[in-house]
């Protein structure tokens, strides 16, 4: 982003005895106390969406140079698109937003509470696409923090969590027996490293697709796309809302496959689009969509042999490299952005940099990891290399926004996204988050004991919630 950033080993086996006595034939003797054969766990999936396009007249998110300039309408609509997965009684919601960031912490609290009370959905991953043509979400109903001057924006952000919940509840109600298939490519050159000064620059080339089909008809229910690159192809001087290239990709996939498409942004902290001949958000989005369609058509879906959802949420509070209590610092930020936005930002970061990590193990073979910020691509690459599962996807801007997380070597290089101004968390914070995700996954896989997965003693401000 451009400156706006300121602003579950014990395996329990029921053994059924079979005793063959050499008389007139076999005699079947069930072992006393044996449990009955377990019923298959149902696997279901459903889709839901809501139009979340704001009204005109809200300050726009993404470029500090806009300051508090107000939007003048929309180039294309913004959506919240959700897939809800059932594995027996356990439920996971995967939500893609055409927003610059994930929901704020108060929004997430409201969303989680509603989903728990109304649908018993315990696992939630909501990622912003990181479009730089969405509304500012951080303003609050306090004098000097948005009240009075930006009441229209506050009214919208008060309504947004309800719209997201509605989309998720629709997906939950629409859930039906499903098959799932995952396909990906890593031989593409669709993104480029915009930060590194090294001759060989890191990228996360993976384009991944999860396809959910109706188990009885084979008709696609939805596809979930995971790709990493900043959606900044729309001219920053255009003060209108736009989903940028992810919006055109989704629309193209939906029209060609007659299904629904959810976009989940990856670790794009240092990733920009490598457009080549596909200049502009529509051309690039449709080209990306063509590649997604190829992956979807080639994917083989099946009912998972052992449907299961295991999840854990970790919260970190990292030391800040920037002193937000210094009035000179806040004054400089206010000049770069606008005062009301900066006051909300400082209030959130005054005790340190808060980070949320979501780790999901789906069906025992798919890792879904979500981090609340702009993680550099090598964080995702290294997680995928070290997680010995068939499929591993990383979702950025997930369930919040904690600014940039450069790798240690990137922080040593400096530059935008790596310097303290927009990546205030202590150096190495990203690595700590990814290590935590890896321990979570191996614990869920039964390869580490739960007693081994307590947060490290040197990070006493790390808290976690497990939802096996």
Task: Outline where the language-model segments fall.
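Conserved beta-alpha junction segments in alpha/beta enzyme cores
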Residues: 35-260, 264-271, 277-286, 296, ...
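Charged, flexible cofactor/metal-binding loops and thiol motifs
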Residues: 289
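Alpha-helical and His/Cys-centered functional microenvironments
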Residues: 8-10, 32, 134-136
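Bacterial N-terminal signal peptides that target proteins for export
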Residues: 1-27
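Bacterial Sec-dependent signal peptides at the C-terminal "C-region" and cleavage site
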Residues: 18-39, 466-468
């Amino acid at each position: 982003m451009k400156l706006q950033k300121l602003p579950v080993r014990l395996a329990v086996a029921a053994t059924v005895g079979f005793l063959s006595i050499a008389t007139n034939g076999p005699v079947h003797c069930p072992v006393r106390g044996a449990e009955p054969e377990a019923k298959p766990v149902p696997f279901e999936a459903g889709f839901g969406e809501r139009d979340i396009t704001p009204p005109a007249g809200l300050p726009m998110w993404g470029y500090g140079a806009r300051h508090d300039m107000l939007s003048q309408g929309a180039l294309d609509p913004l959506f919240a698109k959700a897939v809800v997965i059932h594995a027996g009684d356990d439920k996971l919601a995967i939500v893609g937003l055409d927003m610059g960031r994930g929901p704020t912490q108060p929004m997430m609290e409201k969303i989680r509470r509603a989903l728990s009370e109304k649908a018993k959905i315990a696992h939630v991953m909501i990622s912003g696409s990181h479009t730089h043509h969405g509304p500012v979400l951080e303003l609050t109903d306090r004098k000097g923090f948005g009240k009075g001057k930006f009441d229209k924006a506050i009214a919208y952000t008060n309504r947004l969590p309800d719209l997201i919940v509605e989309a998720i509840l629709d997906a939950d109600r629409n859930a039906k027996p499903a098959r799932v298939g995952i396909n990906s490519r890593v031989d593409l050159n669709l993104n480029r490293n915009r930060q590194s000064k090294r001759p060989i620059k890191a990228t996360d080339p993976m384009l991944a697709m999860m396809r959910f089909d109706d188990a009885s008809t084979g008709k696609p229910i939805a596809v979930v796309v995971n790709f990493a690159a900043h959606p900044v192809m729309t001219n920053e001087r255009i003060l209108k809302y736009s989903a940028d290239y992810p919006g055109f990709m989704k629309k193209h996939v939906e029209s060609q496959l007659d299904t629904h498409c959810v976009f989940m942004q990856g670790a794009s902290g240092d990733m920009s689009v490598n457009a080549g001949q596909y200049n502009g958000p529509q051309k690039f989005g449709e080209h990306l969509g063509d590649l997604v369609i190829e992956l979807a058509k080639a994917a083989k879906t099946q009912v998972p042999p052992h449907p299961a959802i295991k999840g854990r949420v970790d919260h970190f509070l990292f030391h800040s490299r920037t002193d937000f209590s210094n009035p000179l610092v806040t004054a400089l930020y206010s000049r770069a952005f606008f005062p009301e936005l900066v006051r909300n930002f400082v209030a959130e970061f005054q005790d340190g940099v808060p980070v949320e990590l979501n780790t999901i193990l789906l069906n025992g073979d798919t890792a879904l990891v979500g981090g609340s910020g702009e993680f550099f691509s090598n964080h995702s690459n290294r997680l995928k290399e070290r997680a010995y599962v068939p499929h591993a996807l990383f979702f950025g801007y997930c369930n919040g926004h904690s600014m940039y997380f450069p790798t240690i070597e990137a922080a040593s290089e400096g530059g935008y996204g790596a310097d303290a101004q927009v990546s205030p968390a202590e150096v190495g914070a990203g690595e700590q988050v990814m290590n935590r995700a890896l321990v979570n996954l191996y614990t869920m896989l039964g390869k580490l004991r739960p007693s081994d997965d307590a947060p490290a003693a040197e990070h006493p401000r790390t808290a976690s919630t497990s939802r096996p």
